Amino acid sequence: MTRLLPGLLPAIVLLVPFGVAQPFRFPTANHSLYEKGGGEKFLVGTPGKPWTTGAFGCVRTDGWQMHEGLDIRCLQRDRQGEPIDPVMATADGTVAYVNRQPGLSNYGNYIILRHQVDGLEIYSLYAHLSQVGPGLAVGQRVKGGDTIGRMGRTSNTRQRITKDRAHVHLEYDLVINERFDEWHKRHAPGQRNDHGMWNGKNLLGIDPRWLYLAEAEHGARFNLLQFMRSQTELCRVMVRETRFPWLRRYGSLVQRNPVAEREGIAGYEVSLNFNGVPFNLIPRAASEMKSG
């Protein structure tokens, strides 16, 4: 996928009519991503750093730290300068998780919604909220555009989010393992996990910016499954297992292989993007798997 700064978007993206129905909306009224040179108005960076440190990718600590979302800048404030932007569901879905105890996570108050789009399960996460919508509960259905909370500055990090950096942290994630809590107890004994399978360590993010730009470019022809399958490949791994959680949850990412169908599946060849997201899985027969 070609990497372009928001200020250098192709004209086709900038001219897309906003009335076209698309699966994913922005979580706030800030749509500056689509403006020429709008990156600085759309994202807020870390203290003393440019706005690009609020983007997705290895943008923190001089490129050594991964940031798995977008920090979308505040547009509305009260008389005390606190953010009051309504935060909205980006697509139709179901509430998967709500955390109303900001001291338990560096996400602060956060919400996770589950979406089914084009045959793929994907999750949106909204963090640092000052308020979660009253009555919002796990299992509740929401529509894209419904207000689910209010932008804030909540977090449990040592360095607090200042008023000038107020933002909503947005992620689009895939879940690694529904038994994450069991794994965590075995591999991190003594360490707390207050959020079960909704711990951020169990979520693999895709870049929301490129999702929105792909939507703008393709309009009604945008397809989330095709978007996922077109991720840039960093590497491939051979998995000598035929049953693992990713297969059950993301079977739509499995590519047919006549040889494995005929001889039997011995494992999977898995393509990973730069954030380690498995976006293409090819079943392999024993005759196709190299020994090593």
Regions flagged by a language model, labelled:
Residues 7-17:
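Bacterial N-terminal signal peptides
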Residues 105-106, 110-114, 140-218:
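Conserved, short, structured surface segments that act as functional micro-motifs
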Residues 76, 99, 133, 146, ...:
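Sec/Tat-exported extracytoplasmic proteins
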Residues 82-84, 90-135, 161-167:
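Zn2+-dependent peptidoglycan hydrolase active-site motif and core
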Residues 1-4:
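Positively charged n-region of N-terminal signal peptides that target proteins for export
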Residues 69-73, 87, 127-129, 148-151, ...:
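Long, contiguous hydrophobic alpha-helical segments, chiefly transmembrane helices and signal peptides
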Residues 20-109, 194-292:
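Surface-exposed, glycine-biased beta-strand/turn segments
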Residues 74-76, 100, 115-117, 128-130, ...:
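A mature extracytoplasmic/lumenal domain signature
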